[in-house]
């Protein structure tokens, strides 16, 4: 029986010599190694194999070096997976909108992945919010409404990501130490799925009498400054009313719900808020300058 126990310990601990007690050297290092792996894993949520490799290469107790090694491994794996998945279809994900605190600038983006399972995760939704926040920060304000071309999009993806601390509290965005491009590669590394910024649109209220409204259907954890859903719209109106901001948001909601093919058709629709009135009646002397409506996975 004693021989069997020793044989069992020898097989379990590999090359560690067991003669009734564990090697002191092995025993002293094990708790520290496991602690390093646990800490790094909780910090990054990276795969266990990459975390373990990084800790072993850095050496026990050298967490700073392990973090650097892990970061490189994640990027390497993400790059390989991105190359393999580049021809795959990614139609799941979210329409994400972000508007500045003063309401003068807004961005709408479609962020895609391959499965609804990944889209529903908090890390992916947080990434979508960081992407919208970053483009809101960097996109130019020299046009009232424009679709973002691939060249400008790719240039901004190389910038450091801007992270919103708390949009509900209207706190300032703060810069992270990694680029959006790196953030997307990391997400691909973690999920094994293709992740992409499919399209972007920016609006700027360049005249004091104009206001931008946003609305998302099926929004998750929406706030006045950020909304994330399956269908989204942005609209810019011209109005002398002091309530122009509330009016623009109401029109954005009507656009999402009624899916008009043109502005003239939208104006003829009955309002969802007051069925006795058309959208034209709701607007009164105000006018719709431009609007955009997207559905996730659309063109």
From Swiss-Prot:
User: Where does the transit peptide start and end?
Assistant: 1-18
Q: Does the keyword Protein biosynthesis apply?
A: yes
Q: Where in the cell is it found?
A: Mitochondrion
Q: Name one GO biological process term.
A: mitochondrial translational elongation
Gene that this sequence comes from: tsf1
Q: Which organism is it from?
A: Schizosaccharomyces pombe (strain 972 / ATCC 24843) (Fission yeast)
Any one GO CC term of this protein is: mitochondrion
Which keywords are on file for this protein? Elongation factor, Mitochondrion, Protein biosynthesis, Transit peptide
**What name does this protein carry?**
Elongation factor Ts, mitochondrial
The reply to whether Coiled coil figures as a keyword in the UniProt entry is no
What main location does UniProt list? mitochondrion
InterPro entries (alphabetical): EF-Ts_dimer_sf, Transl_elong_EFTs/EF1B, Transl_elong_EFTs/EF1B_dimer
The UniProt function text for this chain reads: Associates with the EF-Tu.GDP complex and induces the exchange of GDP to GTP. It remains bound to the aminoacyl-tRNA.EF-Tu.GTP complex up to the GTP hydrolysis stage on the ribosome.
Q: GO MF annotations for this entry?
A: translation elongation factor activity
Give the family this protein belongs to, as stated in its UniProt record. Belongs to the EF-Ts family.
**Where would you find the membrane-spanning parts of this chain?**
none
